[in-house]
Amino acid sequence: KLKQRGYSRSIPGLYRFLRKQGIMAVHPPNPKYIPKPYEQMDYPGQRIQVDVKFVPSACLKNPKVIGKQFFQYTAIDEYSRWRFVEAFEEHNTYSSAMFIEHLVKAFPLPIQCIQTDNGAEFTNRFTTHRDKPTLFQVHLKQHGICHKVIRPFTPRHNGKVERSHRKDNERFYATHTFYSFEDFAKQLKVYNRRDYNNFPMRPLGWKSPNQVLKDYLASV
């Protein structure tokens, strides 16, 4: 329109002039994201984060297992950081349900809430059967445990279990190889007991998760 009305200077020149005169439109800055304060747990079992890790294929050395996929199911109590892991050959709602059964037996206190992502091994939220509970959710209900799913595409909301998986890559998978599923399951169990639940942590006042649980049980 300016050209049609006889404007002959360059558009960049006009822009510089308007900016110099201070008459450019001012766009307000985008509001700064302020994360919500993290909800602290008051007792063990109040909320436990659960997630699944795919075992790196580079760790599988035996020709009989090369090309197969193993999975590490992980649960972390938010209060004590106590962790329970188990090896599985399949990644589905049945494996998730069996993991919950074993977790309930292993954890020394009642579990109030389980928090997961929106994977189909946990929920039908993003499937064609969204109104139908998964076998995993059925087992949770049988034990009186509520199921909380995090916001989609925000793994930081399950941050404790996500960080533990990154540590697993550094401490375990980077240095270990597995020649069968049974070998993987055995090594994973030993690693978790030795290098995690008995390992002192700064957020726990340099106590181990096992010690925090022990102290809590002694106080009730």
Region locations from a protein language model:
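Basic, flexible linker segments flanking DNA-binding modules
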Residues: 1-60, 120, 127, 131-137, ...
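Residue-level detector of anion-binding/catalytic polar loops
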Residues: 8, 110, 146
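Mobile genetic element proteins and their domesticated derivatives, centered on retroelements
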Residues: 14, 51, 75, 81, ...
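C-terminal domain-tail junction helix/linker
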Residues: 46, 143-145, 166-220
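An active-site-proximal beta-strand-loop segment
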Residues: 50-83
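Active-site beta-loop-alpha junctions of metal-dependent nucleic acid enzymes
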Residues: 68-69, 85-113
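Short small-residue beta-strand/loop micro-motif enriched in glycine and branched aliphatics
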Residues: 82-86, 148-150, 174
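RNase H-like two-metal-ion nuclease catalytic core shared by retroviral integrases
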Residues: 116-118, 126-140, 145-170, 185-189, ...
